[in-house]
């Protein structure tokens, strides 16, 4: 969509009453309305007499509902159609109508031709919109260098949107060598002319130090000015600063208000952030269904991150009914836009056959594409896929792939890498390093890592033997649903290792394991019940114990793996 803001708007009178009841009874307003009607009649009469400027002004009045005229795009188009063939302003506005479908069927090719005719007279707004045509390939062959030339000519004519668009080209290095300082300069020129988009973009430069010295306070002021003018991108950026507490006091409620304001203004990214707020319960009551609705609205606005997030909601049934087919379709849309997480999730669909026909080779290709874009989740999934193959080389590659995700703190990768080092799968067997990896994953709450680390402490493999720490780890893993951890904990209660012997507690844990189908749980349950039915045995003398808590001893030992030669 090209720029179509009116270049002449009647300034709002700050004395105009806003209350409709006051409007009815205010003599001052009635006088003002009379003056506007008379002014409109004067312009209409001049237009009918062939005054080119009056014709354009009447069209603008009808297009935007200003100057006392009712908003009527059809009438606006008819007025613009009466402009002279050599009037640049009239040709430009007629192009705007065709470009946006104002009062006429949309025709981008005809709009481009009209911009070309208007630009021949060096009319700055037409030069700018023609630049947009060349930048996007709308009505002409795409040519970024030509777009830059046209934006530059519009900027030299003092047109703020031309300056702003030229800045964008410098910012991204499109059609011209990338130059953040020149980009910021262009934005600053247009911002001085109070163009909200330029104020926002200059704010971005100030927030992140792109082309100017980083200055969050200045960014905040620019965002506020643009947001006050109703620019949704700035409202959203201001919301992010409030959410982060960056330059302002952290205030999630204010962030949500700004996200909602920007979303209602049609900004897809704001819908996405509003969805995250509902999903996480920040600044608003947590509501998965409302989060999904926001993600869907952002996805319908073609915001790529939300396209992937909507797929996740369908895949896991989070806020929406689980639907693998729809999930795969959204992941496909995201992958087509080179979104690495969407590629990974589409790969998972192909690997599992969820929503698509199973195709492991295609899954591998998607994981590798995502990994090439720096997606660690894709790298982890590729490692998991390779581990399921039979050949040793695949297992060696899997172990190599797990190193980076584990190093940056991904608990699943740390756990799986620990399994590799514990079993010697794809790497040299190193029990101590395996225990270290389990430690790191367990500290982040990974239940399988807690279980494996508990076994290390129970058996003394890879670390010092400490049944009390083992019991604590089994308990934490069991609380997260690990049935095997329940049975391992039951064994410690049965034998009185690391905990006080308690056959009733052991019975409860073995019973839960039996219901879950854990191998050996039924035999252990029968054994404990037999022991409970037998006469009580004499209790052994108490042994001295380490008075430190199991968790404290666990943390004391988390100092990295010792050398294993």
What is the meaning of each model-derived region?
Residues 7, 520-565:
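Terminal, low-structured helical/coil segments at or just beyond the last alpha-helical repeat
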Residues 46, 82-83, 117-118, 153-154, ...:
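Canonical positions in the second alpha-helix
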Residues 48-51, 64-66, 85-88, 100-102, ...:
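Short helix-capping/linker turns of helical repeat alpha-solenoids
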Residues 55, 91, 105, 127, ...:
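Canonical tetratricopeptide repeat
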Residues 57-64, 69, 91-100, 114, ...:
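Hydrophobic face of amphipathic alpha-helices that form TPR/SEL1-like repeat modules
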Residues 370, 501-519, 526:
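TPR/TPR-like (Sel1-like) alpha-helical repeat modules
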